[in-house]
Amino acid sequence: MMELERRAYSKEVHQRLRKQVEEIRQLEMLRAKLQTQINVAQSQVKRLGDKKHLAEMECLLKSRAQVQVEIEALQEQNRALDKQIQDWETHVLTQSKEASAPDLIMYQKMKIQRRIRILEDQLDRVTCHFDIHLVRNAALREELELLRIERGRYLNMDRKLKKEIHLLREMVGALSTSSTSAYTAREEAKTKMGMLQERAEKELAQSDTEAQILLRQISHLEQLHRFLKLKNDERQPDPRVVQKAEQRDWEVSEGLRKTSQEKLVLRYEDTLGKLAQLTGESDPDLLVEKYLELEERNFAEFNFINEQNSEIHHLQEEIKEMQEALVSEHASQDKQRMQQEQQCKMLQQDVDKMCSESEQLEGRFQVLRGQLEKIKTDIQVLFDKAKCDSSVIKDLLGVKTYMRDRDIGLFLSTIERRLVQLLTVQAFLQVQNLAPLADAALLALGQSLQEPSKKTTPLKPPDTMEDSSGAVIKEDYPMSKEELLSQVMKSLQLQDEEESAKKLDSSPSLTLSSPQISLVTVPKHSKKTSVVPESILSHKTNRGRGTGSVSHVTFGDSASAAGPVAMASASASGAPVSSRSSQGGRGGFKPTSSSSYLGSTGYLETSRGRESTAGGVHSQSMGSELSRGLSSSSGHASSPAPPSRPSSSTSKDSRGYN
């Protein structure tokens, strides 16, 4: 029992000790942490930071009082402003109650209407400015389209030239490869020729040596043959020799003559003595040895001389061959030089021929250019004589002191429309005294009567659909110089044929003022113009309001005119009104609308787009500008017709404001 208690007590003590040790360890850790914080807080940097923070806190506390005072002042101002606002609200309320008088209401309505008119005028000016900019944008789009087409042509030409350059480079590469292979084959052939020549030279030298050896052997054999022949001849008995031999034998027998051996010995002794005197050597063996050496040396020299002679002969042959080769080379060079000179002469002739052709083409170009300039000048003169409207052309092309080549079609189309108008007016003036006004209007519009009172020749405007030659001109882009020149030349030929036909038929010519105006037919695209333009006796009514506005165009005097006629569109009812005055040959009528006029010059799409986007707005500013331009271009020979209303009173109908 005691043991159990002791164990329990010891266990409890141990647990308590462990807890105390754990608490001591935690306290020590906390102490170390606090000590670290104390050390950090007691550092110089912390003290400086604390001082800085204390100073900032003092400044903020001082500024807090000032800000509080300012806030109170602003609150006082807000309260004062609120009070003033309440006072003004009460004042406005009282004034609104007192503003029920009729005069004040009328005055305010007048001010509002004046403001509306000012805004409408501003809107009209902005609309006109916008229309002008649309026309300019259309011209710029056309010019951009032309530039795009030119760019496409340039790219096609550049692609073709690049393809040709690529083909030429491939051809040059093939030629260089073939020339390199030919040069390699030539070098190989030249090397083989050198080797064959060396072999031939060696074989020739060897054959020469063998020939010399054979010749030497042949000469030796010939000498041997002669020697043997001589020996054979000596062996044959000769009578004189026999006689001499007998005589010598007799002398020998008598003792009067020595034998041949003795004579030979004596002769040898004499010869040795002479040789000893000549050479200074008395020993016969030495003499024989020297003689053999001398013979060997002579034979060696003979061989050397023969070899030198053969080599000289070989060199002479080589020199002769080289001279022949040089002569042949000089001849080939002379022949090649002659061929090159002939080629140079032929090339020079070709160059001279091309230069002459280029000069002829340049002269022809200058002549054609002069003809084109003359045609442009005549077109300008015809444009001025016809008193065509130049305001639209100035708006489209800008103010220019010269006429470009691509502008000829525009000028001709304007002249054509002007001539159609003049022809219509002339036809109407011719028939106005011979038929009633309704019949005259029908005849002017190209309609035939059931029972015509007088047979008249119908005046047909130029056919703008197709040319007699079958050429069709597209208005997608302007004509080039060559196309324009061909069309003008064809039109001139047609004009000459028409003039000759007129001279043969003796028909009267159309005159405008005093000079004669020849009508040049220029093909246009898409539509044929009717006998009378759509502007004759037409009524230009507003789409939105239902009221019509009147535009007047004045022409000069005509030689064939019988009396004045004024045609204009009436009011909203649409009945035509004709007036006659005492002035001769002066007629005014409503011109073609701006949309149709722009459509005939290639800007129909732009004008239609502008009308469609306006949502029922029909702008007549361009028509008024056309009427002003036509009336001003008539000069001193015509006077403008009186307007139907004052120009200052710009209404909503004329502006097309809906």
Swiss-Prot record:
Residues 496-552, 574-658 are annotated as: Disordered. Residues 506-519, 574-583, 592-604, 621-639 have a biased composition (Low complexity). The modification Phosphoserine is found at S500, S506, S507, S509. Component of the outer dynein arm-docking complex that mediates outer dynein arms (ODA) binding onto the doublet microtubule. Involved in mediating assembly of both ODAs and their axonemal docking complex onto ciliary microtubules. PANTHER family: COILED-COIL DOMAIN-CONTAINING PROTEIN 63 (PTHR21694), OUTER DYNEIN ARM-DOCKING COMPLEX SUBUNIT 1 (PTHR21694:SF35). Belongs to the ODA1/DCC2 family. This is Outer dynein arm-docking complex subunit 1. The gene is Odad1.
